[in-house]
């Protein structure tokens, strides 16, 4: 966990991936820092301080989800993104709102389990290598055939058999020592071995996913699982691949799942972040239709955000200190259309601004995962170095901005469609052409995109 970052450091880290939206970055940075501050308080005071949930308002593609996702990744906190439209009111078929908490705990368990497996990796690899040695040099099968009754009575050949077995054991030990050295030197990596691994059983309760009954299915499956033995199956793998599989198995044996569960539930309760997207789609007063009541979904979300105990397969989880970040474009509705109780549970309001041409230019070149860098890396695998002139970058940004203005505004996602169309021919021919370097100029951009961008009817379908 990295809760020690200052708000300024958090904003600087987010700047590496997200352009603009300073207000949103500041809001999440303060929310994260307050968690660190809360952890330093005396226990009685700590219990009184709940996180201040955030409501992000802004059009699609401006970075709402990315801000929350990068924030969670930065501190290693359990994070899930859910869509408000996927939930249904209690009593209807569909996912109930408590499933978001169960998903958060599952994510937390996975994170903690991976961390603990890393800690025991060296020991697990050592045990996996030992198993590989035993597979490569197996113990001889002991003779269990019919014994002469006279030999059993007088023990005629007993000493001879014992001597023979001890000689075999000595030879096997020598062979295993040699194989150990070869394994350590990496000489047997491509050798094919047959190993027994625990079979991953597909659950008959998978069909319950998305029906709101998955928790019942999990509990029933766990009850059955304790009675049914685990199946194993044989797999033929190279030593290199077998080591990975066996190391994973040994690591899972070495970690204490009770400890994992305890830590995971604690992290979910104290550090968890739930991002509720499209909350504007359940806002509004029109609840008298044949559709599932949107207001009913809001009322179901309310107790989770306020603080409740949710039953999960890992035990009861308190939602009092989980940070909720809700987001919506609010094109057809406004935040005041949410029920008053839910509005009050999101005291921090952040409005994200529409992206300008300058923002598009920065998005194309500045972030660590910038689109221009991604396409350059992809084409470099074909031996082609691609370079964009500053004027070409500007031209791409202007076209993206203009198409957003003329059609639906989908924010930075427009750049993906623009770049795909721009480099479509080059990507198709890259494996066949002999050019070592290609420079993208404004004229090239104009040739590939301008005609389409100017024709509003065409750009709606292509860009």
Swiss-Prot record:
Please tell me whether the keyword DNA repair is annotated for this protein: no
The record's section on Pfam families has: AAA, AAA_2, ClpB_D2-small
According to the UniProt record, which cysteines are disulfide-bonded? none
* Record localization: Cytoplasm
GO BP: protein unfolding; proteolysis involved in protein catabolic process
Q: Which residues bind ATP?
A: 19, 61-66, 277, 341, 413
List where the protein spans the membrane: none
Alphabetically sorted, this entry's keywords are:
ATP-binding, Chaperone, Cytoplasm, Nucleotide-binding, Stress response
Give the matching InterPro entries: AAA+_ATPase (IPR003593), ATP-dep_Clp_protease_ClpX (IPR050052), ATPase_AAA_core (IPR003959), Clp_ATPase_C (IPR019489), HslU (IPR004491), P-loop_NTPase (IPR027417)
What coarse category fits the chief subcellular location reported for this protein?
Answer: cytoplasm
Which SMART domains does the protein's record reference? AAA, ClpB_D2-small
One GO cellular component term noted in the UniProt record for this chain: HslUV protease complex
What Gene3D superfamilies does the annotation carry?
A: 1.10.8.60, P-loop containing nucleotide triphosphate hydrolases (3.40.50.300)
What NCBIfam families has UniProt attached to this entry? Answer: hslU (TIGR00390), PRK05201.1 (NF003544)
Q: How does it assemble?
A: A double ring-shaped homohexamer of HslV is capped on each side by a ring-shaped HslU homohexamer. The assembly of the HslU/HslV complex is dependent on binding of ATP.
Q: What does this protein do?
A: ATPase subunit of a proteasome-like degradation complex; this subunit has chaperone activity. The binding of ATP and its subsequent hydrolysis by HslU are essential for unfolding of protein substrates subsequently hydrolyzed by HslV. HslU recognizes the N-terminal part of its protein substrates and unfolds these before they are guided to HslV for hydrolysis.
Question: According to its UniProt record, which protein family does this protein belong to?
Answer: Belongs to the ClpX chaperone family. HslU subfamily.
- The protein here is known as ATP-dependent protease ATPase subunit HslU
Source organism of the structure: Bacillus cytotoxicus (strain DSM 22905 / CIP 110041 / 391-98 / NVH 391-98)
């Amino acid at each position: 966990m990295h809760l020690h970052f200052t708000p300024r450091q958090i904003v600087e880290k987010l700047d590496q991936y997200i352009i603009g939206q300073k207000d949103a970055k500041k809001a999440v940075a303060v929310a994260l820092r307050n968690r660190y501050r809360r952890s330093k308080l005396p226990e009685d005071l700590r219990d009184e301080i709940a996180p201040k949930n955030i409501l992000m308002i802004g059009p699609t593609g401006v970075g709402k989800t990315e801000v929350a996702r990068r924030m969670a990744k930065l501190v290693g906190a359990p994070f899930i993104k859910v869509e408000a439209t996927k939930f249904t009111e209690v009593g209807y078929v569909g996912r109930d709102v408590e499933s978001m908490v169960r998903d958060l705990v599952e994510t937390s368990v996975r994170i903690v389990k991976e961390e603990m497996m890393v800690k025991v990796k060296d020991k697990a690899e050592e045990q996996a290598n030992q198993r590989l040695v035993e597979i490569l040099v197996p113990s001889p099968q002991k003779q269990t055939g019919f014994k002469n009754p006279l030999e059993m009575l007088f023990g005629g050949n007993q000493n001879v058999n014992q001597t023979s077995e001890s000689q075999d054991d000595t030879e096997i030990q020598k062979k295993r020592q040699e194989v150990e050295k070869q394994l350590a030197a990496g000489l047997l990596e491509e050798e094919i071995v047959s190993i027994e691994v625990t079979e991953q059983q597909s659950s008959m309760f998978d069909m319950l996913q998305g029906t709101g009954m998955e928790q019942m299915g999990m509990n029933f499956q766990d009850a059955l699982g304790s009675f049914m033995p685990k199946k194993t199956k044989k797999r033929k793998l190279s030593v290199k691949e077998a080591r990975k599989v066996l190391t994973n198995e040994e690591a899972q044996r070495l970690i204490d799942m009770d400890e994992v569960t305890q830590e995971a539930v604690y992290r979910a309760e104290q550090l968890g972040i739930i991002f509720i997207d499209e909350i504007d789609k359940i806002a509004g007063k029109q609840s008298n239709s044949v559709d599932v009541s949107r207001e009913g979904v809001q009322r179901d979300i309310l107790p989770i955000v306020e603080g409740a105990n949710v039953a999960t397969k890992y035990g009861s989880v308190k939602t009092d200190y989980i940070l909720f970040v809700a987001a919506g474009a609010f094109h057809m509705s406004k935040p005041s259309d949410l029920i008053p109780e839910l509005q009050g549970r999101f005291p921090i309001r952040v409005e994200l601004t529409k992206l300008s041409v300058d923002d598009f230019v920065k998005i194309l070149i500045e972030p660590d995962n910038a689109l221009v860098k991604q396409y350059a890396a992809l084409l470099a695998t074909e031996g082609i170095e691609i370079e964009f002139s500053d004027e070409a970058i500007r031209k791409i940004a202007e076209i993206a901005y203009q198409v957003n203005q003329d059609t639906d505004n989908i924010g930075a996602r427009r750049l993906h469609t623009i770049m795909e169309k721009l480099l479509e021919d080059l990507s198709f021919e890259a494996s066949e052409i002999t050019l070592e370097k290609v420079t993208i100029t404004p004229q090239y951009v104009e040739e590939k995109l301008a005609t389409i961008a100017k024709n509003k009817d065409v750009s709606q379908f292509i860009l």
